């Protein structure tokens, strides 16, 4: 797994074409109207659907106002610098409502649950579950076979670019509603108890809890049983 450099991300955002994509339902005398060179139009008689950049479509709507009877515009962003990740060919289970930006790496058989927000430059390892409403900030890196509990936040670091990102190593379990601050590394096999605020590195194979989080014990068989990762939840159809 590779981690994007902060300056690479900054340049990506700076140089990107800022877009305001829209979907427009339109009704009227539509024959012969030029909705713009980059607009995709699906016109059938006096009704149609347009997909394109708002500035281009808006200009066409204003220029042909007399011909248009009704318009409904769907729009969910303005001057957006980073598109959403194309999910179609990712070998992972990604549930509805997850927001995943471009330049995110997702390993095979990972699970991304509803409401998760994953920012540019994040890396998610094979077989890792990102539970509901988790936030992975820019450049946050999670290893293989981890579980990041519902509502947890892994702080992002894009600005300032010198800041060290959160790194969660393999086989880590993070409970619900935890906060892992920038620069923290959570060591392999560690467990972070629900609600913890982690401000310092977590040693491998330890359990931490509290605010700020402190080591409360080493991993034992009882803890392993309570925090077992279930591979059945990560299984995909064979043809996927």
UniProtKB/Swiss-Prot annotation:
Its EC number is 2.3.1.89. InterPro entries: DapH, DapH_N, Hexapep, Trans_hexapeptide_repeat, Trimer_LpxA-like_sf. Pathway: Amino-acid biosynthesis; L-lysine biosynthesis via DAP pathway; LL-2,6-diaminopimelate from (S)-tetrahydrodipicolinate (acetylase route): step 1/3. Signal peptide: none annotated. It comes from the Bacteria. One of its GO terms (molecular function) is tetrahydrodipicolinate N-acetyltransferase activity. Keywords: Acyltransferase, Amino-acid biosynthesis, Diaminopimelate biosynthesis, Lysine biosynthesis, Repeat, Transferase. One of its GO terms (biological process) is diaminopimelate biosynthetic process. Coiled coil: none annotated. It is an enzyme of class 2 (transferase). It catalyses: (S)-2,3,4,5-tetrahydrodipicolinate + acetyl-CoA + H2O = L-2-acetamido-6-oxoheptanedioate + CoA. Belongs to the transferase hexapeptide repeat family. DapH subfamily. Catalyzes the transfer of an acetyl group from acetyl-CoA to tetrahydrodipicolinate. This is 2,3,4,5-tetrahydropyridine-2,6-dicarboxylate N-acetyltransferase. The gene is dapH.
């Amino acid at each position: 797994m590779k981690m994007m450099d902060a300056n690479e991300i900054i340049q990506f955002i700076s140089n990107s074409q800022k877009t305001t994509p829209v979907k427009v339902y339109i009704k009227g005398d539509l024959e012969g109207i030029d909705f713009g060179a980059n607009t995709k139009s699906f016109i059938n008689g006096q009704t149609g659907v347009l997909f394109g950049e708002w500035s281009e479509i808006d200009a066409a709507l204003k220029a042909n106002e007399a011909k248009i009877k009704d318009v409904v515009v769907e729009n969910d962003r303005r001057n957006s610098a980073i598109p959403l990740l194309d999910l179609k060919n990712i070998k992972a289970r990604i549930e509805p409502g997850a927001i995943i930006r471009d330049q995110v790496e997702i390993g095979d058989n990972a699970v991304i649950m509803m409401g998760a927000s994953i920012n540019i430059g994040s890396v998610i390892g094979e077989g890792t579950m990102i539970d509901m409403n988790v936030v992975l900030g820019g450049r946050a890196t999670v290893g293989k076979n981890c579980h990041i509990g519902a509502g947890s936040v892994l702080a992002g670091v894009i600005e300032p670019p010198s800041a060290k990102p959160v790194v969660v190593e393999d086989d880590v379990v993070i409970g619900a509603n935890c906060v892992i601050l920038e620069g923290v590394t959570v060591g392999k096999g560690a467990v972070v108890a629900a609600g913890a605020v982690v401000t310092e590195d977590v040693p491998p194979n330890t359990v931490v809890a509290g605010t700020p989080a402190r080591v409360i014990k080493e991993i034992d068989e009882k803890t392993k049983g309570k925090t077992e990762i279930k591979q059945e939840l990560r299984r995909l159809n064979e043809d996927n």
